Curated annotation (Swiss-Prot):
Enzyme class at the top of the EC tree: transferase
Any one GO CC term of the record: cytosol
Enzyme Commission (EC) number: 2.1.2.9
InterPro entries in the cross-refs: Fmt, Formyl_trans_C, Formyl_transf_N, Formyl_transf_N_sf, Formyl_transferase-like_C_sf, Met-tRNA-FMT_C, Met-tRNA-FMT_N
Name of the coding gene: fmt
Keyword presence, Protein biosynthesis: yes
Residues that hold (6S)-5,6,7,8-tetrahydrofolate according to the record: S109, I110, L111, P112
Alphabetical list of HAMAP family matching this protein: Formyl_trans
Annotated keywords: Protein biosynthesis, Transferase
Protein name: Methionyl-tRNA formyltransferase
CDD domains, sorted: FMT_core_Met-tRNA-FMT_N, Met_tRNA_FMT_C
Protein backbone atom coordinates (compact mmCIF):
# COMPACT_ATOMS: atom_id res chain seq x y z
CA UNK A 1 0.00 0.00 0.00
CA UNK A 2 1.58 3.27 -1.18
CA UNK A 3 1.02 6.43 0.85
CA UNK A 4 1.68 10.09 0.15
CA UNK A 5 1.75 11.79 3.55
CA UNK A 6 1.04 15.46 4.27
CA UNK A 7 1.68 16.91 7.72
CA UNK A 8 3.79 19.40 9.61
CA UNK A 9 3.90 19.43 13.47
CA UNK A 10 4.65 16.81 16.13
CA UNK A 11 1.04 15.58 15.94
CA UNK A 12 1.63 14.61 12.31
CA UNK A 13 5.01 13.06 13.09
CA UNK A 14 3.40 10.56 15.47
CA UNK A 15 1.13 9.38 12.65
CA UNK A 16 3.94 9.22 10.10
CA UNK A 17 6.11 7.23 12.50
CA UNK A 18 3.30 4.69 12.97
CA UNK A 19 2.94 4.30 9.21
CA UNK A 20 6.62 3.43 8.90
CA UNK A 21 6.47 1.08 11.88
CA UNK A 22 3.53 -0.76 10.31
CA UNK A 23 5.40 -1.21 7.03
CA UNK A 24 3.36 1.10 4.83
CA UNK A 25 5.22 2.33 1.77
CA UNK A 26 5.69 6.09 2.19
CA UNK A 27 6.23 7.26 -1.38
CA UNK A 28 6.59 10.96 -0.54
CA UNK A 29 6.01 13.45 2.25
CA UNK A 30 4.71 16.99 1.89
CA UNK A 31 5.27 19.45 4.73
CA UNK A 32 5.40 23.20 5.24
CA UNK A 33 8.53 25.20 4.32
CA UNK A 34 11.27 25.79 6.88
CA UNK A 35 10.57 28.92 8.94
CA UNK A 36 12.72 31.42 10.86
CA UNK A 37 12.32 30.84 14.59
CA UNK A 38 13.31 32.77 17.71
CA UNK A 39 14.96 36.09 18.29
CA UNK A 40 17.82 35.19 15.95
CA UNK A 41 15.36 34.01 13.27
CA UNK A 42 17.17 30.72 12.69
CA UNK A 43 15.70 28.83 9.73
CA UNK A 44 14.11 25.73 11.29
CA UNK A 45 12.52 22.70 9.60
CA UNK A 46 9.08 21.48 10.70
CA UNK A 47 8.89 18.50 13.05
CA UNK A 48 7.93 16.07 10.28
CA UNK A 49 11.00 17.00 8.24
CA UNK A 50 13.28 16.66 11.28
CA UNK A 51 11.95 13.16 11.86
CA UNK A 52 12.52 12.14 8.24
CA UNK A 53 16.06 13.51 8.10
CA UNK A 54 16.93 11.64 11.30
CA UNK A 55 15.21 8.32 10.59
CA UNK A 56 14.14 8.02 6.93
CA UNK A 57 16.40 10.33 4.97
CA UNK A 58 15.75 8.49 1.70
CA UNK A 59 12.06 9.51 1.69
CA UNK A 60 11.31 12.27 -0.85
CA UNK A 61 10.35 15.50 0.94
CA UNK A 62 8.45 18.36 -0.69
CA UNK A 63 7.88 21.77 0.91
CA UNK A 64 5.81 23.87 -1.49
CA UNK A 65 4.67 27.26 -0.23
CA UNK A 66 1.58 26.77 -2.40
CA UNK A 67 0.10 23.29 -2.86
CA UNK A 68 -2.51 24.55 -5.34
CA UNK A 69 -0.50 24.24 -8.54
CA UNK A 70 -0.90 21.80 -11.46
CA UNK A 71 2.75 20.81 -11.07
CA UNK A 72 2.18 19.54 -7.53
CA UNK A 73 -0.85 17.47 -8.52
CA UNK A 74 1.13 16.01 -11.42
CA UNK A 75 4.03 15.14 -9.13
CA UNK A 76 1.72 13.33 -6.69
CA UNK A 77 0.17 11.37 -9.57
CA UNK A 78 3.63 10.13 -10.52
CA UNK A 79 3.85 8.30 -7.19
CA UNK A 80 0.56 6.44 -7.93
CA UNK A 81 -0.53 6.50 -4.27
CA UNK A 82 -3.28 4.28 -2.92
CA UNK A 83 -4.03 6.90 -0.24
CA UNK A 84 -3.08 10.42 0.69
CA UNK A 85 -2.94 10.78 4.48
CA UNK A 86 -3.24 14.33 5.84
CA UNK A 87 -2.61 15.49 9.42
CA UNK A 88 -2.29 19.17 10.37
CA UNK A 89 -0.63 19.93 7.04
CA UNK A 90 -1.34 23.66 7.06
CA UNK A 91 -2.73 24.17 3.56
CA UNK A 92 -6.09 23.40 1.97
CA UNK A 93 -5.82 20.77 -0.77
CA UNK A 94 -7.23 21.60 -4.21
CA UNK A 95 -9.75 19.38 -5.98
CA UNK A 96 -7.04 18.20 -8.39
CA UNK A 97 -5.26 16.46 -5.51
CA UNK A 98 -8.41 15.23 -3.78
CA UNK A 99 -9.41 13.39 -6.97
CA UNK A 100 -6.13 11.44 -7.30
CA UNK A 101 -7.05 8.81 -4.69
CA UNK A 102 -8.85 8.61 -1.33
CA UNK A 103 -7.56 11.40 0.93
CA UNK A 104 -7.85 10.69 4.66
CA UNK A 105 -7.55 13.50 7.16
CA UNK A 106 -6.85 12.90 10.86
CA UNK A 107 -8.59 15.91 12.39
CA UNK A 108 -8.02 16.76 16.05
CA UNK A 109 -11.65 17.02 17.15
CA UNK A 110 -14.81 14.95 17.10
CA UNK A 111 -16.39 16.27 13.93
CA UNK A 112 -18.52 18.12 13.07
CA UNK A 113 -17.46 20.15 16.11
CA UNK A 114 -14.45 22.44 15.75
CA UNK A 115 -13.95 22.36 12.01
CA UNK A 116 -10.97 24.46 11.00
CA UNK A 117 -7.43 25.38 11.95
CA UNK A 118 -7.40 25.33 15.77
CA UNK A 119 -9.56 22.46 17.08
CA UNK A 120 -7.43 21.67 20.13
CA UNK A 121 -7.06 25.27 21.25
CA UNK A 122 -10.78 25.87 20.69
CA UNK A 123 -11.77 22.83 22.75
CA UNK A 124 -9.62 24.03 25.65
CA UNK A 125 -10.96 27.59 25.42
CA UNK A 126 -14.53 26.32 25.56
CA UNK A 127 -13.81 24.16 28.59
CA UNK A 128 -14.43 20.82 26.89
CA UNK A 129 -13.65 17.83 29.09
CA UNK A 130 -13.69 15.31 26.24
CA UNK A 131 -12.61 15.70 22.63
CA UNK A 132 -10.78 13.35 20.28
CA UNK A 133 -9.65 12.57 16.76
CA UNK A 134 -11.75 11.98 13.66
CA UNK A 135 -10.63 10.13 10.53
CA UNK A 136 -12.41 11.72 7.61
CA UNK A 137 -12.49 11.18 3.86
CA UNK A 138 -11.67 14.61 2.54
CA UNK A 139 -13.97 16.53 0.23
CA UNK A 140 -14.05 20.01 -1.25
CA UNK A 141 -15.45 21.64 1.91
CA UNK A 142 -13.66 22.53 5.14
CA UNK A 143 -13.49 19.41 7.33
CA UNK A 144 -16.97 18.34 6.20
CA UNK A 145 -16.12 15.00 4.58
CA UNK A 146 -17.59 11.63 5.46
CA UNK A 147 -16.43 10.17 8.78
CA UNK A 148 -14.45 6.91 8.65
CA UNK A 149 -13.86 6.56 12.39
CA UNK A 150 -13.11 8.44 15.58
CA UNK A 151 -11.49 8.06 19.00
CA UNK A 152 -12.54 9.95 22.14
CA UNK A 153 -10.02 11.36 24.63
CA UNK A 154 -10.22 13.21 27.92
CA UNK A 155 -8.54 16.62 27.82
CA UNK A 156 -9.48 18.09 31.19
CA UNK A 157 -6.58 19.82 32.99
CA UNK A 158 -4.28 19.37 29.97
CA UNK A 159 -2.61 22.21 28.10
CA UNK A 160 -2.33 22.50 24.34
CA UNK A 161 1.04 20.77 24.00
CA UNK A 162 -0.08 17.88 26.21
CA UNK A 163 -3.26 17.42 24.18
CA UNK A 164 -1.36 17.53 20.89
CA UNK A 165 1.01 14.83 22.16
CA UNK A 166 -1.86 12.67 23.42
CA UNK A 167 -3.88 13.11 20.24
CA UNK A 168 -0.87 12.30 18.07
CA UNK A 169 -0.65 8.82 19.58
CA UNK A 170 -4.41 8.33 19.35
CA UNK A 171 -4.50 9.53 15.73
CA UNK A 172 -1.64 7.19 14.82
CA UNK A 173 -3.54 4.12 16.03
CA UNK A 174 -6.75 5.31 14.38
CA UNK A 175 -4.97 5.93 11.07
CA UNK A 176 -3.52 2.42 10.93
CA UNK A 177 -6.91 0.91 11.78
CA UNK A 178 -8.67 2.91 9.05
CA UNK A 179 -6.13 2.09 6.35
CA UNK A 180 -6.10 -1.62 7.18
CA UNK A 181 -9.90 -1.83 7.14
CA UNK A 182 -10.77 0.85 4.59
CA UNK A 183 -12.72 -1.40 2.21
CA UNK A 184 -14.99 -2.61 5.03
CA UNK A 185 -15.86 0.83 6.42
CA UNK A 186 -19.23 2.44 5.71
CA UNK A 187 -18.56 6.22 5.78
CA UNK A 188 -20.89 8.31 7.93
CA UNK A 189 -22.24 11.66 6.72
CA UNK A 190 -21.59 14.58 9.06
CA UNK A 191 -24.56 16.40 10.56
CA UNK A 192 -23.88 19.94 9.42
CA UNK A 193 -26.51 21.33 11.76
CA UNK A 194 -24.25 20.34 14.69
CA UNK A 195 -21.09 21.84 13.20
CA UNK A 196 -18.93 24.62 14.63
CA UNK A 197 -15.88 26.33 13.18
CA UNK A 198 -12.63 27.49 14.71
CA UNK A 199 -10.34 30.18 13.39
CA UNK A 200 -6.61 30.32 12.83
CA UNK A 201 -4.84 31.52 15.99
CA UNK A 202 -3.28 35.01 15.80
CA UNK A 203 -0.67 36.53 18.10
CA UNK A 204 -3.22 39.05 19.38
CA UNK A 205 -5.37 36.20 20.71
CA UNK A 206 -2.89 35.87 23.57
CA UNK A 207 -3.84 39.24 25.08
CA UNK A 208 -5.43 38.96 28.53
CA UNK A 209 -7.03 41.72 30.55
CA UNK A 210 -7.84 42.05 34.23
CA UNK A 211 -11.47 42.33 33.17
CA UNK A 212 -11.25 38.72 31.92
CA UNK A 213 -12.35 36.06 34.39
CA UNK A 214 -9.87 33.78 36.16
CA UNK A 215 -11.30 30.84 34.23
CA UNK A 216 -10.91 32.64 30.89
CA UNK A 217 -7.30 33.57 31.61
CA UNK A 218 -6.48 30.03 32.78
CA UNK A 219 -8.08 28.59 29.64
CA UNK A 220 -6.10 30.94 27.40
CA UNK A 221 -2.89 30.02 29.19
CA UNK A 222 -3.55 26.32 28.57
CA UNK A 223 -4.75 26.80 24.98
CA UNK A 224 -1.88 29.05 23.88
CA UNK A 225 0.95 27.39 25.82
CA UNK A 226 3.10 26.81 22.73
CA UNK A 227 2.11 29.97 20.83
CA UNK A 228 1.34 32.83 21.16
CA UNK A 229 1.40 32.56 24.96
CA UNK A 230 -0.52 35.07 27.07
CA UNK A 231 0.47 38.65 27.82
CA UNK A 232 -0.84 41.84 29.39
CA UNK A 233 -1.62 45.07 27.55
CA UNK A 234 1.80 46.46 28.50
CA UNK A 235 3.47 43.49 26.76
CA UNK A 236 4.44 41.58 29.91
CA UNK A 237 4.31 37.84 29.20
CA UNK A 238 2.76 35.59 31.84
CA UNK A 239 4.92 32.48 31.48
CA UNK A 240 3.58 30.42 34.38
CA UNK A 241 0.25 30.96 36.09
CA UNK A 242 -2.47 29.03 37.85
CA UNK A 243 -5.96 29.84 39.02
CA UNK A 244 -5.87 30.81 42.69
CA UNK A 245 -9.48 31.40 43.76
CA UNK A 246 -12.98 32.52 42.76
CA UNK A 247 -12.92 35.29 45.35
CA UNK A 248 -14.01 38.64 43.91
CA UNK A 249 -11.75 41.62 44.60
CA UNK A 250 -10.90 44.91 42.91
CA UNK A 251 -9.32 43.58 39.75
CA UNK A 252 -5.97 44.68 38.47
CA UNK A 253 -4.34 44.76 41.91
CA UNK A 254 -1.97 42.40 43.72
CA UNK A 255 -4.16 40.55 46.20
CA UNK A 256 -1.70 38.15 47.90
CA UNK A 257 2.04 37.60 48.19
CA UNK A 258 2.63 33.84 48.07
CA UNK A 259 5.72 31.69 48.60
CA UNK A 260 5.95 31.13 44.83
CA UNK A 261 4.95 34.58 43.60
CA UNK A 262 1.87 36.74 43.87
CA UNK A 263 -1.81 36.78 42.95
CA UNK A 264 -3.67 39.25 40.77
CA UNK A 265 -7.33 40.03 41.22
CA UNK A 266 -9.24 39.66 37.95
CA UNK A 267 -12.90 39.47 37.10
CA UNK A 268 -14.59 36.76 39.20
CA UNK A 269 -11.43 35.50 40.88
CA UNK A 270 -7.66 35.55 41.28
CA UNK A 271 -4.76 34.11 39.30
CA UNK A 272 -1.35 33.33 40.77
CA UNK A 273 1.64 34.53 38.77
CA UNK A 274 4.69 32.25 39.07
CA UNK A 275 6.92 33.44 36.23
CA UNK A 276 6.79 36.42 33.89
CA UNK A 277 8.79 38.41 31.38
CA UNK A 278 8.65 42.15 30.83
CA UNK A 279 9.26 43.52 27.30
CA UNK A 280 12.95 43.39 26.27
CA UNK A 281 13.90 41.72 29.56
CA UNK A 282 14.72 38.18 30.64
CA UNK A 283 12.14 35.84 32.14
CA UNK A 284 12.03 36.07 35.92
CA UNK A 285 10.40 34.23 38.80
CA UNK A 286 7.42 36.13 40.14
CA UNK A 287 8.82 36.28 43.68
CA UNK A 288 12.01 37.91 42.34
CA UNK A 289 9.89 40.34 40.33
CA UNK A 290 7.96 41.34 43.44
CA UNK A 291 11.11 41.76 45.52
CA UNK A 292 12.98 43.68 42.83
CA UNK A 293 10.20 46.21 42.39
CA UNK A 294 9.26 46.24 46.08
CA UNK A 295 5.62 45.63 45.26
CA UNK A 296 3.04 44.97 47.94
CA UNK A 297 -0.61 43.98 48.27
CA UNK A 298 -2.83 46.57 46.63
CA UNK A 299 -0.24 47.65 44.04
CA UNK A 300 -0.73 47.28 40.30
CA UNK A 301 1.85 45.75 37.96
CA UNK A 302 0.78 47.73 34.90
Amino acid sequence: MKIVFMGTPEYATAILRALFENNFKISAVFTQPDKPVGRKQILTPPDVKKFLLESHADTPIFQPSNIKTPEIAKKICEFSPDFIVVAAYGQILPLEILEICPCINLHASILPKFRGASPIQSAILEGEKISGVTAMKMGAGLDDGDILGFSFCGIQKLDESEVFHKFGNVAAKLCIKILQNFDDIAPLKQKNVLSSKCKKIKKTDGLVKFSDSADEISAKFSAFKTWPGIFLENGTKLLEIRKFSDEKKEFGKISHITKDGFTLAVKDGEIEILKLQEPSKKAILARDFINGKRLKIGDRIS
